[in-house]
Amino acid sequence: MSHLLTMSELSEQEISEILKDAEDFANGKERKTTEQTFVANLFFENSTRTRFSFEVAEKRLGLEVLDFSADASSVQKGETLYDTIRTLESIGTKAVVIRHEQDRYFDELKDQVNIPILNAGDGCGNHPTQCLLDLLTIKQEFGRFEGLKIAIVGDVRHSRVARSNAEALTKLGATIYFASPEEWKDEENTFGTYKSLDELVPEVDVMMLLRVQHERHDHYETDIMKEYHEQHGLTVEREKRMKEGSIIMHPAPVNRDVEIASELVECERSRIFKQMENGVYVRMAVLKRALPNVLGGMKHELFV
């Protein structure tokens, strides 16, 4: 069964196949099932990009989408996540997409359910489809991962994007650097080296900014925000010193004039909205992987 829970579980070959399928979808090579197939989206945290791009991906593949609301479900009556998934499985759902506030919520589910789980984000833990769409964006830009220098900047400790991306990009041959306020460093993430932002600006090929996750912060950390943009954000002045041909990325939502100057969000270097576009193609690809009997399977040569 093809769960997608973390980037750790994917080999280079599997990453390559997913990205090749995503590129095919981006180039208009869509396939649509004529067999009625139900997929449920279970979002226990707020989401715009991930939730709606999964829904667009599902509908473009001809899947029937069951839109789940935790507030209107039996979760409010104490039903467990396991029982919710087993219920959906029993009534004919073929896969579930889940975003949950609990880190690694899937550990207690993956060996007990009989339908694929696609992780749309777990707490501060993992965000594999965001990582894959970021990989697709980088691949489109540079044609490779090997030898690239990538800075992951900002709220590293609370970021599932930082964890997933640093691990996957290291596996694919890129060099990862982190820049972060001291309080937001993640000592458990060993896939990169910490440097100052100003040192990294002229060196890296990709400046990957992270959202400041106010909802996960302790109250004492609010002091960091007073001068965050000037000290830790991508200002107009810093962008001017970036390496020729380098790009700006951000998983969004963007806090304008916090992580990045507002006028840079859609500047020539920015690939922020391209990432969002690629999210649909990547999620089509992971749905195809999860439902090979419905959507078919293809093998592709390794490109990395």
Swiss-Prot record:
Top-level EC class as recorded in UniProt: transferase
Encoding gene (name): pyrB
Enzyme Commission number(s): 2.1.3.2
HAMAP family in the cross-refs: Asp_carb_tr
Keyword Transport: no
GO MF entry, a single one: amino acid binding
Homology family: Belongs to the aspartate/ornithine carbamoyltransferase superfamily. ATCase family.
Name the UniProt record assigns to this protein: Aspartate carbamoyltransferase catalytic subunit
Gene3D superfamilies to which the protein is assigned, alphabetical: Aspartate/ornithine carbamoyltransferase
GO annotation, biological process: 'de novo' pyrimidine nucleobase biosynthetic process; 'de novo' UMP biosynthetic process; amino acid metabolic process
Lineage: Bacteria, Bacillati, Bacillota, Bacilli, Bacillales
Catalytic reactions of this protein: carbamoyl phosphate + L-aspartate = N-carbamoyl-L-aspartate + phosphate + H(+)
